[in-house]
UniProtKB/Swiss-Prot annotation:
Belongs to the GST superfamily. It comes from Homo sapiens. The lineage of its organism: Eukaryota, Metazoa, Chordata, Craniata, Vertebrata. Keywords: Coiled coil. Signal peptide: none annotated. This is Ganglioside-induced differentiation-associated protein 1-like 1. Gene3D superfamilies: 1.20.1050.10, Glutaredoxin (3.40.30.10).
């Protein structure tokens, strides 16, 4: 039985080798950057991560694992193909959420608990620590900015930028996503009313409740006045971070060290800030918030963090983010349900369906 912190002792011998028994479950390569840890110092038991490549929470967990230099066996759970609702995954997490990690006899299905567990469990002289020593000034700073950054309503930014592209500049979200999500919103009320009056044994009341809450949330995110309010609050958060980065420059003036948000050492706060800026740029908000020259320290930070090995490995080139999310799904769909013919025309048709997968991903679970 899961404990309140979502850490479940269990016999893990039953978990599937792969959702689709595809190449997606191959272990990730160990980083070769200077910050990578030595395999000799890792626990014998493997660390297994179930994630979706474009899930915001999954990305942050993967960045933490990569920055610490840990070997991790990654298993992709495709949200566009609803693999998070399949029985094998629901045995890991009834909440149908990614990420989930398995290590030793533990299943951990909460984003915050995963990060804390990885940082607490994988330690040693040759393992990178992302949390400064408890009681230090740097530790207090990391806790402060972790709370601040994790509180940002990324799902609201995402839905808002899809529904109101006029608020963005150079967004990497395809334009047809707006029309698609609006079409589904228009039909959602009718569809849910039908489900309420139909006898569908596979649809439980919790499921209907969850769908109604999702619809209500998206409708709230469609409110322009609400969006402008939270984007204004985002600007204040980024102002605070800009000022903090300026303090680091003044505190360490003349010293030969690379400056990060909480000091000279790269910490969890930098992981979270880097992931946040990457997502905001994808949504088309970077020109408004730092690329216009209004926050030069933030701009410098983003340029530096993108050059780190872990960020290149996990997030790749931001201009191919959407492409990297949807192409594997086309091939996995072909592998799961092979057609009677497999020619070039079918492959092109599969790739042509990338927009469909992109939309469903953006609608269902962007964080």
């Amino acid at each position: 039985m899961a404990t309140p912190n979502n850490l479940t002792p269990t016999n893990c011998s039953w978990w599937p080798i792969s959702a689709l028994e595809s190449d997606a479950a191959k272990p990730a390569e160990a980083p070769d950057a200077p910050e990578a840890a030595s395999p000799a110092h890792w626990p014998r038991e493997s660390l297994v991560l179930y994630h979706w490549t474009q899930s915001f929470s999954s990305q942050k967990v993967r960045l933490v694992i990569a920055e610490k230099g840990l070997v991790c066996e990654e298993r992709d759970v495709s949200l566009p193909q609803s693999e998070h609702k399949e029985p094998w995954f629901m045995r890991l997490n009834l909440g149908e959420e990614v990420p989930v990690i398995i290590h030793r006899d533990n299943i951990i299905s909460d984003y915050d608990q995963i990060i804390d567990y990885v940082e607490r469990t994988f330690t040693g002289e040759h393992v990178v620590a992302l949390m400064p020593e408890v009681g230090s000034l740097q530790h207090a700073r990391v806790l402060q900015y972790r709370e601040l950054l994790d509180a940002l309503p990324m799902d609201a930014y995402t839905h808002g930028c899809i529904l109101h592209p006029e608020l963005t500049t150079d967004s990497m979200i395809p334009k047809y996503a707006t029309a698609e999500i609006r079409r589904h919103l228009a039909n959602a009320t009718t569809d849910l009313m039908k489900l309420d009056h139909e006898e569908e044994p596979q649809l439980s009341e919790p499921y209907l409740s969850k769908q109604k809450k999702l619809m209500a949330k998206i409708l709230e995110h469609d409110d322009v006045s609400y969006l402008k309010k939270i984007l204004g609050e985002l600007a204040m958060v980024l102002d605070q971070i800009e000022a903090e980065l300026e303090k680091r420059k003044l505190e360490n003036e003349g010293q030969k060290c690379e400056l990060w948000l909480c000091g000279c050492a790269f910490t969890l706060a930098d992981v979270l800030l880097g992931a946040t800026l990457h997502r905001l740029k994808f949504l088309g908000l970077s020109k408004k918030y730092w690329e216009d020259g209004s926050r030069p320290n933030l701009q410098s930070f983003f340029e530096r963090v993108q050059r780190r090995f872990a960020f290149r490995k996990v997030l790749g080139d931001i201009h191919t983010t959407l492409l990297s999310a949807v192409i594997p799904n086309a091939f996995r769909l072909v592998k799961r349900k092979p057609p009677s013919f497999f020619g070039a025309s079918f492959l092109m048709g599969s790739l042509g369906g990338m927009g469909y997968f992109a939309y469903w991903y953006l609608k269902k679970k962007y964080i």
